[in-house]
Amino acid sequence: MHNVVLSLDGRKEVNDNMRPTVNNKGSYDIIAPKFKKLVSERPKDKYYYIRGTFTRDNLDFSEDVLHFANEGFKLTSVEPVVGEEENPYALREEDLPKVFEEYEKLAVQYADMKLKGDGFSFFHFMIDLNQGPCVIKRITGCGAGNEYLAITPSGDIYPCHQFVGNEDFKLGNILDEKIELPKEVTNMFREAHVYAKDECRNCWNKFYCSGGCHANAINFNNDIKVPYKLGCEMQKKRTECSIMIQAKMMLEGN
């Protein structure tokens, strides 16, 4: 497999808080050594990402990213949790200042480490200012329902993993004698590009964000063409930080 995603929520205390075992003990000490072994034995031409999650319980998530790097994981990603506000761990609009502060803090440390030759990759700070992806990827970055599908253990087909269980978006089953993905659904996803979304059309970040997550738009706004606001604001901050890192590398690098 060309790419694997290794899911570990963050530092030991962060991971064990969100991911206890069935006997209510922490899972970090079970999982982390296995991930390290996989990475150490993985061919250099194959990719991996260690993927964490930040919630209201670890808004200091820059520490989780640096923890991954210090543990030897050089390809990292830490994603914001997505959940309804009544969930105690869900992010809220009032958390944005702290989230922005953490991205800025991480960006400075990230750039400094790269300049010292001890760098690593953080998925959300990877940006190509010279060329970047093709125009199709720029206007609709999510391939759900067309380039990407999720298959459940029972064989049900959905546009992506976030739609699993939503019967309105069930596309079929791999055990069906003939599989024809419903055009009304696949076309809806295909047509949900940045020029079809009022909030995106005049946004400075649209060609780096590419319209955001379709599932979040539907789950929070019941409309695939109305982006998830918290996601938009965090993506703008990540782009700003990515540009700052590029500028710092150009000005201070060799």
What is the predicted role of each segment?
Residues 14, 21-32, 44-51, 84-121:
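Short acidic, glycine/proline-enriched helix-loop-strand junctions
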Residues 13-18, 75-97, 119-133, 158, ...:
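Flexible glycine/acidic-rich beta-alpha junction loops that bind and position SAM and/or redox cofactors
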Residues 1-81:
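Radical SAM/AdoMet-radical enzyme domain recognition
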Residues 142-145:
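Short, small/polar residue-rich loop motifs at catalytic or cofactor-binding pockets
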Residues 154, 159, 195-254:
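Radical SAM enzyme core and accessory elements
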Residues 98-131, 162-210:
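C-terminal accessory region of radical SAM enzymes
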Residues 53, 133-134:
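Basic/polar, acidic-poor N-terminal "presequence/leader" segments
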